[in-house]
């Protein structure tokens, strides 16, 4: 569960390491983002030679949350951190690699590129 002012790890190779959630996209009353939801983020920590610089504003999709996500079969999935993947202006991935596991819910939300690049889909 991610909300405004939440800090997330970045799970791709764009050069950003940590971002701050500015806004949850998807309506005026949407307060929390879960796995597969889009958010607007500001880069708070970045590597010196990365393509994304500190202070840059971008959209991102949440790929892991510490808050458990309920599946249709009644099971739950939970991760050790909150993480996202940065997106470009047309909704495509900005990076070329994805680090760490991602949730299967991304497949249902049509983020096939992220699912195919992830080392593990849980």
Curated annotation (Swiss-Prot):
InterPro entries, sorted: Ribosomal_uL14, Ribosomal_uL14_bac-type, Ribosomal_uL14_CS, Ribosomal_uL14_sf
Entry keyword set: Ribonucleoprotein, Ribosomal protein, RNA-binding, rRNA-binding
Stored CDD domains: Ribosomal_uL14
Coiled-coil features, chain-numbered ranges: none
GO molecular function: large ribosomal subunit rRNA binding; structural constituent of ribosome
GO cellular component assignments: cytosolic large ribosomal subunit
SUPFAM superfamilies: Ribosomal protein L14
Keyword Transport annotated: no
Gene Ontology biological-process entries: translation
Record flagged with keyword DNA repair: no
PANTHER family, per database record: 50S/60S RIBOSOMAL PROTEIN L14/L23, LARGE RIBOSOMAL SUBUNIT PROTEIN UL14M
UniProt subunit comment: Part of the 50S ribosomal subunit. Forms a cluster with proteins L3 and L19. In the 70S ribosome, L14 and L19 interact and together make contacts with the 16S rRNA in bridges B5 and B8.
Function: Binds to 23S rRNA. Forms part of two intersubunit bridges in the 70S ribosome.
UniProt xrefs under HAMAP family: Ribosomal_uL14 (MF_01367)
Protein name, entry field: Large ribosomal subunit protein uL14
Source organism per UniProt: Christiangramia forsetii (strain DSM 17595 / CGMCC 1.15422 / KT0803) (Gramella forsetii)
Lineage: Bacteria, Pseudomonadati, Bacteroidota, Flavobacteriia, Flavobacteriales
């Amino acid at each position: 569960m991610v909300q405004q002012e939440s800090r997330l790890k970045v799970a791709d190779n764009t050069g950003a390491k940590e971002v701050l959630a500015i806004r949850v996209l998807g309506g005026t009353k949407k307060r929390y983002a879960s796995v597969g939801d889009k958010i607007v983020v500001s880069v708070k920590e970045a590597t010196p030679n990365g393509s994304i610089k500190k202070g840059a504003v971008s959209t991102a999709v949440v790929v892991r949350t510490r808050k458990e996500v309920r599946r249709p079969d009644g099971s739950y999935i939970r991760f050790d951190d909150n993480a996202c993947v940065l997106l470009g202006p047309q909704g495509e991935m900005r990076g070329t690699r994805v680090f760490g596991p991602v949730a299967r819910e991304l497949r249902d939300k049509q983020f096939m590129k992220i699912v195919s690049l992830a080392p593990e889909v849980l």
